[in-house]
Regions:
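Bacterial N-terminal signal peptides that target proteins for export
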Residues: 1-11
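Bacterial N-terminal signal peptides
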Residues: 9-19
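Acidic/His- and Gly-rich active-site-bordering loop/insert found
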Residues: 24-31, 35-151, 160-180
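His/Asp/Glu-rich mid-to-C-terminal helical/loop segments that flank catalytic regions of hydrolases
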Residues: 28-29, 258-261, 265, 269-273, ...
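Divalent metal-coordination and catalytic microenvironments
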Residues: 70, 91, 111, 122, ...
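Histidine/acidic-residue-rich, glycine-tolerant segments that coordinate divalent metal ions
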Residues: 141-150, 156-157, 173-295, 305, ...
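Acidic-enriched catalytic cores of C-N bond-cleaving enzymes acting on peptides and small amides
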Residues: 250-286, 291-293, 306-337, 345-387, ...
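Zn-dependent metallopeptidase/amidohydrolase metal-coordination segment
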Residues: 376-458, 476-543
Length: 543
């Protein structure tokens, strides 16, 4: 009875963690120890932080244009060509050195400005979601292009936030002659958890002192320590058999699809005997060509998620054994390849506490009636509580007991967090109570809600960079936590081998299909103030 009560308590705690995170918009944010905001710095530091925030306020139009432009590109993972060309163009014009094609990934890049220590990295994701096309500002399902991808995770907003912050900080660094280096980078193919482990292998973070990440949410928030959620391995299993006429001589065939189905059946029976924390799911990516041909080739794609390295590795081993068993039962051959991976996240206490002080100073944007009307409109459409938009920032949380983590989503920022002191800023560019990875999550992402949320987030990010540049004790404390607490007992072990390569072919066919029509609707800021205006959308449109 005691064990059952403990498990139920852990489940309820995990549910609360997810609810709090969704409400605050932070990545992590699970209950645990309440953090302590970093005390204000010396007067000159605080003066410069106020100055950088005021400067970002004057950059609102440029920020809005970046957010809208990337939204209109709507590119899937590994296919973010227009997005990367556009963003690197802005940075290059502002004096950043650009290294393109980083880690052998055509859409990956690093933009660097400055010299010396500390080296502060600013990262955020840029890819979007299949079949999530949606007109912004419209509070019901209304695709821009039916079936096309769209920013149903809000990844059009994070790098514009970082660019805004970096340009404002750069101005102060030049004037004040502050030593230090700014390093901007994009999260390519995050929805495939497909790139960041290759960045690490290629050395992107070897000289970085602190990494500040940004991810869209519905509130301003940050947490430290082990958050809720999981890491994962993304594995494709391909079975090879022998074709035959499915009616005339089926006994001469060896069905690769049978092997896929046997593996899926086996895994579904195995679920009952796996830990509650695990999440596993699959899609059949090749199931044959037509019913009258015994499929000679078939593939299934699995995500194996767990809360720590050892259990993720164990799930992969179970999957491999099950695939081998399925091949034996069907007299087929099986091979596998890794398409992506992510470590569970662990965020830095010092960096998070520093960031939270700036969150308190900036606070949430001032939402107007139109913003709240759109938010309540889509919440009503989805039959969710009509709470509107966030009006109060959450608490700084951290130090979650691993036993309280009952699983959840994954993000390959986890790999980065185990290689350099990292904190993730959740910023209020979206609407609470949305399902995630859905057309509904694209509704706000080229509207004043996103524009205001990104500006608020850029202020927090820039102020945190100023703190790190001018208060070397914070960088040292962040390093101490990373070395003496986070990685004292657990070291980073990559899920990829030296021979594994990024899955660059993923999403090619989808973008080839929809890209030409999407290109006709790219945002043109020389003709229209906003993307809403270009699309002829009255803000807000609800029913």
């Amino acid at each position: 009875m005691k064990t059952r009560t403990t498990v139920l308590t852990a489940i309820l705690t995990s549910i609360l963690a997810i609810a709090l995170s969704a409400q605050r918009g932070g990545r992590g944010g699970a209950p645990g120890q309440q953090g302590t905001p970093t005390p204000p710095g010396p007067p000159r530091v605080e003066e410069l932080k106020k100055e950088v925030a005021a400067d970002i306020e004057t950059m609102k139009v440029a920020t809005q244009q970046m957010v809208d432009q990337v939204f209109s590109f709507g590119e899937l993972g590994f296919q973010e060509f227009e997005t990367s060309k556009y963003l690197t163009g802005i940075l290059e014009k502002n004096g950043f050195r650009i290294e393109r094609g980083f880690a052998g990934i055509p859409t990956a890049w690093v933009a660097t400005w400055g010299n010396g220590k500390p080296v502060i990295a600013l990262g955020s994701d840029i890819d979007d979601i299949p079949q999530a096309s949606q007109k912004p500002g419209v509070g019901y399902h209304d695709p821009i292009i039916e079936g096309a991808p769209g920013h149903g995770e809000g990844h059009n907003s994070g790098v514009p936030l970082n660019v805004t912050a970096a340009l404002a900080v750069k101005k102060i660094m030049e004037r004040e002659k502050l030593p230090g280096t700014l390093k901007l980078w994009p999260g390519v193919a995050e929805e495939l958890v497909g790139a960041k482990m290759y960045y690490i292998r290629a050395g992107m973070f070897r000289d970085v002192d602190v990494n500040l990440f940004a991810h869209v949410g519905s509130n301003l928030g940050v947490s430290w320590g082990a958050g809720f959620g999981t890491g994962l391995q993304s594995i494709e299993y391909t079975f090879k058999g022998e074709s035959a006429h499915a009616a005339a001589q089926p006994w001469r065939g060896r069905s690769a699809l049978d092997a896929v189905e046997m593996m899926d059946i086996g895994w579904n029976f195995r679920r009952e005997h796996l830990r509650l924390q695990q999440r596993s799911h699959s899609v059949i990516v090749n199931g044959g060509d037509q019913p009258n041909v015994v499929p000679p080739n078939a593939s299934v794609w699995y995500y194996f998620r767990e809360t720590d390295y050892a259990h993720i590795k164990e799930l992969r081993e179970i999957g491999d054994a099950m695939a081998k068993a399925a091949s034996m039962m069907t007299n087929t051959e099986v091979t596998s390849r890794i398409l992506g991976a992510a470590w569970p996240q662990h965020m830095n206490k010092t960096v998070a506490e520093t960031m939270y002080t700036n969150i308190q100073n900036i606070g949430l944007p001032k939402w107007d009636d139109a913003d709240v009307t759109l938010a309540k409109g889509i919440q009503r459409e989805l039959k969710q509580p009509q709470i509107g938009l966030a009006t109060q920032i959450g608490q700084l949380r951290g130090g979650l007991d691993p036993e309280q983590n009952m699983g959840g989503p994954s993000d390959d920022i986890g790999d980065v967090s185990w290689n350099v002191p990292t904190a993730t800023l959740g910023y209020p560019a979206n609407i609470p109570n949305l399902p995630g990875h859905n057309w509904a999550n694209a509704i706000a992402m080229a509207t004043p809600i996103a524009h205001k949320g990104v500006t608020a987030g850029a202020k927090v990010q820039a102020m945190t960079v100023i703190d790190l540049l001018m208060r070397p004790e914070l960088v040292q404390q962040a390093s101490d936590y990373f070395r003496n607490v986070q990685t004292k007992d657990q070291k980073y072990i990559p899920f990829i081998s030296d021979k594994d390569q990024p899955a660059l072919w993923l999403n090619e066919k989808i973008m080839e299909k929809y890209g030409p029509e999407m290109k006709k609707l790219y945002y043109d800021p020389t003709k229209y103030k906003t993307y809403l205006e270009q699309l002829g959308i009255k803000y807000p449109t609800v029913r």
